[in-house]
């Protein structure tokens, strides 16, 4: 979820959730949440955190992928976020209408909901055109026209806006299923 208050404004909330089954650092989960992407601080001024059950994996994802994603470029908070131990994670919903993720870490409880889902579409992006420039990307994407993101019961700012992605009109709020990055 990459959210803005105005389509031509800056991103005000950035969220990326990973459920990883294979990596150089094993399995794990990582929720990168920047509620103040341009702030070069985290707690207590802003909830700029990575909630994870595998620190090595989380740092690998942030350093090699998240920091390369267009919405996260220039997000000073990324370098200053706190890494918080994961205490629980659960998914619910389906891929046709609504999907939810719940993540709990020390002093952080996050609920993410993607609704009004579009038709799934397959993406195959060669390394030369990928965010990292080093990996080919293969994934099934599903756009969401509406999202809800709450932290500790408080709604996060922003809403999804239209974007161009992989040669088609898309949204800044989406699900990426079976996302596979292959180093070339």
Task: Label the predicted regions.
Residues 1-184:
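Targeting-peptide/extracellular-domain and disordered-appendage signature
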């Amino acid at each position: 979820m990459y959210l803005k208050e105005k389509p031509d404004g800056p991103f005000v909330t950035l969220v990326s959730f990973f459920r990883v089954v294979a990596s150089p650092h094993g399995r794990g989960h990582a929720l990168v949440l920047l509620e103040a992407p341009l702030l070069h601080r985290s707690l207590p001024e802003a909830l700029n955190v990575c909630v994870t059950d595998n620190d090595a994996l989380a740092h690998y994802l942030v350093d090699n992928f998240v920091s390369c994603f267009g919405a996260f470029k220039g997000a000073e908070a990324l370098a200053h976020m706190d890494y918080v131990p994961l205490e629980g994670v659960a998914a619910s919903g389906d891929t046709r209408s609504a999907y939810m993720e719940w993540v709990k870490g020390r002093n952080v409880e996050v609920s993410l909901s993607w609704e009004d889902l579009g038709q799934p579409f397959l993406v195959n992006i060669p390394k030369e055109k990928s965010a990292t420039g080093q990996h080919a990307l293969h994934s099934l994407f599903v756009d969401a026209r509406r999202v809800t993101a709450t932290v500790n019961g408080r709604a996060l700012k922003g809403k999804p806006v239209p974007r161009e992605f992989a040669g088609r009109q898309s949204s800044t709020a989406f699900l990426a299923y079976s996302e596979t990055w292959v180093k070339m």
